[in-house]
From Swiss-Prot:
Compartments it resides in: Secreted
Annotated WAP domain residues: 29-77, 83-131
Induction: Up-regulated by bacterial lipopolysaccharide. Up-regulated in lung after infection with M.tuberculosis. Down-regulated by IFNG. Up-regulated in lung in response to bacterial pneumonia. Up-regulated in macrophages after exposure to L.major. Not up-regulated in spleen in response to bacterial pneumonia. Up-regulated in wounded skin.
Resulting phenotype, residue 92 to D: Loss of antimicrobial activity
Any Gene Ontology CC annotation: Golgi apparatus
SUPFAM superfamilies xrefs: Elafin-like
Protein name as catalogued: Antileukoproteinase
């Protein structure tokens, strides 16, 4: 008889423990509003210690964005209407890096500034001027 009265208490206790965990777990995968600024082709002289791993480690509206040297908290730029293809062709690269999964700076042309296109570079996709 006493175990029936204990069941609702146990359920409420479990929900009280699990509810904050589910909220926090989802936050790590979510992203904040706005887009990371487009990355320009650049050489990194020294890899820096990452400032962040997720947007939620950055203050306010800042997003955790990758640049040539690592990840940093930066102010996002407004998201424009997505552009999948810009005019022009990508330059063919003759060399390839030996990295198994090279990091991509972009996925489509709309992520690159101005007339730059998202092209296959020596080591992953990068924003390059078209031919």
């Amino acid at each position: 008889m006493k175990s029936c009265g204990l069941l609702p208490f146990t359920v409420l206790l479990a929900l009280g423990i699990l509810a904050p965990w589910t909220v926090e777990g989802g936050k790590n995968d979510a992203i904040k509003i706005g887009a990371c600024p487009a990355k320009k082709p650049a050489q990194c002289l020294k890899l820096e210690k990452p400032q962040c791993r997720t947007d939620w480690e950055c203050p306010g509206k800042q997003r955790c964005c990758q640049d040539a040297c690592g990840s940093k908290c930066v102010n996002p730029v407004p998201i424009r209407k997505p552009v999948w293809r810009k005019p022009g062709r990508c330059v063919k690269t003759q060399a390839r890096c030996m990295m198994l999964n090279p990091p991509n700076v972009c996925q489509r042309d709309g992520q690159c500034d101005g007339k730059y296109k998202c092209c296959e570079g020596i080591c992953g996709k990068v924003c390059l001027p078209p031919m």
